[in-house]
Amino acid sequence: HIMATGIIHSRVESGDQMTFSILASPSTHKYLTEKGYIAIDGISLTVGEVENGIFHLHIIPETLRLTTLGSKQIGDVVNLEIDSNTQLIVETIERLMKDRGVE
């Protein structure tokens, strides 16, 4: 399900591929990891680099052809869905740390 929204911060075409930088809602920052998974407008993708609340997506031609990503522009709002396994891991670790008095 949709967890938050993000804003397309940059869009760079390189040959037939495209790299997007997405400014993520603060509520999602703890779930963003390089090579982790996220869905953008229902499209499941692998996260590239992550820095200061911005994550990068390196989109191959086939994905651009089969989805609406190629039409996204800077400033567009996108729906973010965090991978459920990532959520489970992060929230379990947080709970265990809290139970042990580690903040």
Show which residues each predicted segment covers.
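Conserved loop->alpha-helix
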Residues: 1-103
